[in-house]
Every structure is written in structure tokens, then in C-alpha cells.
Amino acid sequence: IPSVQASGNIRQILMDLSKRYQDIIIDAGGQDSEALRSAMTVSTHMLLPFRPKRRDLKTLVHVEKLIRLAKAVNPELYTRAVITQCPTLPSQVQRILDAKEACESFDLIPLNNFTCNRNIYDDADENGLSVFEMSSDEKAKQEIEQIAKEFLGDL
């Protein structure tokens, strides 16, 4: 898979890449940046991950403003939230539901599917691999497949 590293205003880079590739995936990191903002102006889809923790959910106010600004330039931008690193204990389900509700309160629709807190995600990241390349952890693979299918549909 070809990859490009870029920072700053990446709008023109993305527009050039879109002439050569059908699909472009952008990982703009977990903070507000010029790269994130410029990517939002030309992207078709944007998936925003949030852990079901106060520290992440407190950023929803800022994220809502960013989305509003981006949609002023790119009204077709399809945005969704995904809850990640969720606890696996059944007693913690309310934490996931509360995180989804928090997203909805800022007009950010959460996906039904989510990822659980699994070591395989960290292990794969450290090795520069995906969970599909890394292991036989079928639950992690299934989580990612379900998120992709729900978010991208039949693209």
C-alpha cells in the first residue's frame, strides 16, 4: 500500500493524490492541526475516535466547532464517531452508552459498533501492522470489519 507523509496544509497533496487513487485514508493524529483542518475541506468521510473517558469526551465541544467549520467549506463531509478502547466487563456497558449519548448531544452520530480494549491493537501498532496481518484475534478482526462496513457501507 503506497503511503505519503505530509504535514501543514495538505489540501493540494490530497487533491493530487485523488487523481491517482480511488481511496485515500488520512490519519491526522489526535489533535487539532493544520493538516487535520485542510484534510477536512476535501475529504468525503471522517471517522472520529473517542474513548469512553471524560478526557476524550471533553473535546467534543471543540470537535463540534471544527466539524461546523469544515462543513461550511465541504457540506458533503460525512462525519461519524466511533467509541474505541471500551472496557470488556459487562458492568461497564453504561460507560459506552454514555459516551455515545455525549457524542449525540454534540450532533455527532456514533457508530453502533465499537472496539474493545485489547492488547492486540497496541501490539499491531508497535509492529506497524494491522490486526489482520498480526494475529488470530478473531474478535479484534471482527470489530474492525464491522466498523468499516458500518462506516463505509457499500463504497
What are these regions (language model features)?
Residues 1-26, 30, 34, 73, ...:
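P-loop/Walker-type NTP enzyme "switch/lid" segment
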Residues 16, 33-54:
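Inter-motif core of Ras-like GTPase G domains
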Residues 26, 48, 81-83:
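Structural beta-sheet core signal
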Residues 65, 94-100:
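Charged helix-capping and loop-helix junction motifs
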Residues 87, 99-129:
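Beta-strand-loop-alpha "switch" segments that mediate conformational coupling across diverse proteins
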Residues 121-148:
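Inter-lobe coupling/hinge region of RecA-like P-loop helicase motors
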